[in-house]
């Protein structure tokens, strides 16, 4: 077994578990980085082993296949993200605080572990049908929906708005920001944009802004 050369993070990744041996942790860390950068299909077991500093046999000791490794990583990263969002957007908080918590967790995760966030974002469609029932019970979109429903009750979100469209708008805004940030389209730290992201989302969902936009569209003859 080769000695890995990768420096440890200043903070432990959320997807590491207490009983994971060091070799498994390093394999997962380097596999995640490669998957986030190149996609699962674009990565070979040999590449993962080379980056982690371990032989292919070490990977197969823990995972039957590369796809099994990818699925395990996805479930761990997704659940860690959900738990962070859930803790920051607790049901007893008012709508504004819950939305603030969601945006804050998202941008902090982009700084703390962008590979994990981008991997979950990019692989959600293909991985979600394959995850365990326990993971499926923890829906990030469901958490956003619950937050929006509270906003409706507090008159912070328009009651006649289609929640699915609002969920798509919020998740799409955050996901595209993450991708553009990773491409260098935004300068500075992710958290520097947190306040503006939150204000954009509030404008999307607020009753007053929706009514203004609808009125303008009607005057332009855009509504049927």
Give the label of every model feature segment.
Residues 1-22, 211-224:
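N-terminal intrinsically disordered/low-complexity leader segments
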Residues 23-31, 48, 73-77, 81, ...:
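Generic hydrophobic, amphipathic alpha-helix propensity
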Residues 117-122, 130, 152-200, 208-224:
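Hydrophobic/aromatic-rich alpha-helical bundle segments in the mid-to-C-terminal region
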Residues 2, 26, 34-68, 72:
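Helix-turn-helix
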Residues 28, 70, 74, 78, ...:
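Amphipathic, non-transmembrane alpha-helical scaffold segments
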Residues 107-146, 165:
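Short secondary-structure transition hinges
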């Amino acid at each position: 077994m080769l000695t890995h050369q990768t420096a440890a993070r200043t903070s432990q990744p959320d997807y590491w578990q207490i009983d994971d041996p060091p070799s498994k942790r390093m394999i997962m860390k380097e596999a995640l980085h490669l998957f986030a950068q190149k996609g699962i299909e674009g990565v070979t077991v040999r590449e993962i082993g080379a980056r982690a500093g371990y032989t292919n046999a070490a990977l197969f000791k823990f995972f039957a296949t590369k796809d099994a490794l990818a699925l395990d990583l996805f479930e761990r990263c997704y659940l860690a993200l959900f738990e962070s969002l859930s803790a920051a957007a607790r049901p007893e908080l008012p709508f504004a605080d819950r939305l603030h918590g969601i945006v804050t967790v998202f941008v902090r995760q982009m700084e703390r572990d962008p590979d994990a966030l981008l991997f979950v974002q990019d692989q959600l469609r293909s991985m979600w049908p394959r995850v365990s029932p326990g993971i499926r019970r923890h829906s990030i979109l469901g958490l956003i929906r619950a937050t929006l429903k509270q906003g409706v009750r507090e008159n912070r979100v328009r009651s006649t708005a289609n929640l699915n469209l609002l969920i798509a708008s919020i998740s799409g805004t955050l996901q595209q920001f993450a991708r553009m940030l990773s491409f260098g389209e935004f300068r500075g730290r992710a958290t520097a944009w947190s306040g503006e992201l939150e204000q954009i989302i509030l404008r999307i969902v607020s009753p007053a802004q929706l009514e203004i936009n609808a009125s303008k569209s009607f005057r332009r003859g855009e509504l049927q």
